Amino acid sequence: MIKLGIVMDPISEINIKKDSSFAMLMAAQERGYQLFYMEMADLAIVNGVAMGNMRPLKVMNDANHWFELGEAKDTPLSELNVVLMRKDPPFDTEYIYATYMLERAEEQGVLIVNKPQSLRDANEKLFTAWFSEFTPETIVTRDANRIRAFHQAKGDIILKPLDGMGGTSIFRVKQDDPNLGVIIETLTQYGNQYAMAQAFIPEITKGDKRILVVDGEPVPYALARIPKKGETRGNLAAGGSGVAQPLSDSDWKIARAIGPELKKRGLIFVGLDVIGDKLTEINVTSPTCIREIQAAFDVDITGMLFDAIETRLGQ
């Protein structure tokens, strides 16, 4: 029997209709896995051994009663076969420390999804630079003059921090916007923090597409997150609405080009963000949208994921 641990935000606070981690847990349980629940505070290293204060978990597809937890037991992570790291950003130093603990468990024989080193290496915004042939024109800098020159040249840009999530602190700055200066100061903390500027992509009105890639293979359907009226962010967390749709030719091209590199890096479950035919982000920490896509189309994303996990476990 496969023993699966998950590190996530409090399970008591999730929306099971939309939560991808919950979809994964339900699928694993249906396959007969034993589930163990952890939050970040439950991870520890004791004399070089990665430990988890883990609780046996049962999940139910019931909006009033969706989980039951057993008694916590301090256990070496090496007693598990696989750990899903599903903690949401912020990708802060605490998150980085957690990846080191999980890397220790990996060295002790546990499959970690996604690979801890690659979680550190692949910043969700910056990692797109490795695939710049697919991105809008982009700069990453903390230099206000460089941002101003980029804005001058493009006229309509998006400015965002490198560590945001769910559309937080994303600004659209048009030509002659009087707020450019204060937005630059805020995002760069007066020149002390890197920020990203991208040429605005008008196709955002048709949605910011989330394309899921499982062990290098694109899922054939995406979730287009359509911004609400008067908004430039499609993120569901920012009030956007989701419409599932088949991948376009350009979506396939992007996902197939990036997939092999993701697989090579041990990034087994990844969400690409695409606007029009441009790649804007590569989400590796805890990508979502499984529930919405599986509800709209006959596609078994969690099945793809656990097939990939079992292949890697040699099952």
Swiss-Prot record:
EC supergroup of this enzyme: ligase
UniProt KW Nucleotide-binding keyword: yes
Cofactor: Mg(2+); Mn(2+)
InterPro entries for this protein: ATP-grasp, ATP_grasp_subdomain_1, Glut_synth_pro, GSHS_ATP-bd, GSHS_N, PreATP-grasp_dom_sf
Keyword Membrane among record annotations: no
PROSITE patterns to which the protein is assigned, alphabetical: ATP_GRASP
Gene Ontology CC: cytoplasm
Pfam annotation, one family: GSH-S_ATP
UniProt keyword annotations, A-Z: ATP-binding, Glutathione biosynthesis, Ligase, Magnesium, Manganese, Metal-binding, Nucleotide-binding
The EC number(s) this enzyme carries: 6.3.2.3
Annotated cofactor note: Binds 1 Mg(2+) or Mn(2+) ion per subunit.
ATP-grasp domain: residues covered: 125-310
Residues the record lists as binding ATP: 151-207
Any GO MF annotation of the entry: ATP binding
Pathway noted in the entry: Sulfur metabolism; glutathione biosynthesis; glutathione from L-cysteine and L-glutamate: step 2/2
Binding site for Mg(2+): E281, N283
Reaction equations catalysed: gamma-L-glutamyl-L-cysteine + glycine + ATP = glutathione + ADP + phosphate + H(+)
Family membership: Belongs to the prokaryotic GSH synthase family.
Annotated protein name in UniProt: Glutathione synthetase
Organism: Shewanella oneidensis (strain ATCC 700550 / JCM 31522 / CIP 106686 / LMG 19005 / NCIMB 14063 / MR-1)
Name of the gene: gshB
